[in-house]
């Protein structure tokens, strides 16, 4: 229902317009207060790159963060990552991730980024506190913040927006009548707009999510996902249909698709109940970090990597690298 409202297919969005105007007024006032200097943002002693969204819901932001971290690491840059840690609850903040940190403590996306990149990752509702925790423990040269475009309390040097190329901005209205956290005109002020799927417009960077080999959660064995039989597909991400479509494009045709809420807590019994005799469970990598501790032999995940096209990605990386002292 929310998807139909936000796309404009359902007329119910009109009933939510008063709340949207209020949301837009408050969010605009917050941004203006920082722009005018009425509120002061904290500036880190190293450059800060924000990777965020203009809309609610999954746009492919985490793969972009991983891509950016890995590309900078390849250039010899020491990178740290901060996040709010949505979906997790730590005993105390800021929380600096270790190999023992669970998704229940830090959230699924920070744990995924930490496991994939090996970069220092810290989470805290106040992102400045997370930055300070990383700087106190690691000699990093640059900070990437996973989400936080609207978190103006942390000053930033580069802003990158990730856009769902199929859904774009829906009906264009602020939450809750539409998907917008900020209006589309905000794109004029960011340093780069990366478009996940669909067709990128002039000045935007095209991106595709390229699937790799399926990985067994228990053994680490790898195989072509199309070789797996009797698949039950599970996706607890912002836009589950994207994952199911990826499986189909890989030649894997699930018998059943189970969409879950983004960041949903997964209990062992609930996940086990999804898979019947002779079936194979295939999930996203973000779900896998939550399920690895209680995984069965027939559970697999399909990793995806961001692939950015054209000359703009290299120019963006050169610009970011030039900020490192």
Swiss-Prot record:
SUPFAM superfamilies given in the database record: P-loop containing nucleoside triphosphate hydrolases (SSF52540)
Enzyme Commission number, as recorded: 2.7.1.130
Binding site for ATP: 55-62
Keywords linked to the UniProt accession: ATP-binding, Kinase, Lipid A biosynthesis, Lipid biosynthesis, Lipid metabolism, Nucleotide-binding, Transferase
Pathway where it operates: Glycolipid biosynthesis; lipid IV(A) biosynthesis; lipid IV(A) from (3R)-3-hydroxytetradecanoyl-[acyl-carrier-protein] and UDP-N-acetyl-alpha-D-glucosamine: step 6/6
Transmembrane segments: none
Cellular component terms per the entry's GO annotation: plasma membrane
InterPro entries: LpxK, P-loop_NTPase
Reaction catalyzed: a lipid A disaccharide + ATP = a lipid IVA + ADP + H(+)
GO molecular function: ATP binding; tetraacyldisaccharide 4'-kinase activity
GO annotation terms (biological process): lipid A biosynthetic process; lipopolysaccharide core region biosynthetic process
Function in brief: Transfers the gamma-phosphate of ATP to the 4'-position of a tetraacyldisaccharide 1-phosphate intermediate (termed DS-1-P) to form tetraacyldisaccharide 1,4'-bis-phosphate (lipid IVA).
Family according to the record: Belongs to the LpxK family.
Protein name: Tetraacyldisaccharide 4'-kinase
Organism: Salmonella typhi
Upper taxonomic lineage: Bacteria, Pseudomonadati, Pseudomonadota, Gammaproteobacteria, Enterobacterales
